[in-house]
């Protein structure tokens, strides 16, 4: 088991990981919700950025490459009929890392091969923008 998700009413769920950490989701404002918490589709888009950075962290750790900073701004674009995520744009800031171009290229490739990206690649247009 990975988690337990409980419907709390008012289009809100509570999600509890086996380690005990908890998050709450809410339907977005444009789909009958209050927009007070991440929506389920927000979590999908955010999971992509988190997975991208986690895999880069693993890649760098295994190769003893210093990885001191990264920040990703996530933009999720929805489509309708049926309602779904059509696009995810990641704006990635790696400033402060002392990587040459060859290393950066390999690091980016590792991140783009993360499990969430592989899962989404045939269903969602993913764009990566680097600052």
Specify the residue positions occupied by each region the protein language model found.
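Extended beta-strand/beta-hairpin segments
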Residues: 1-46, 57-131
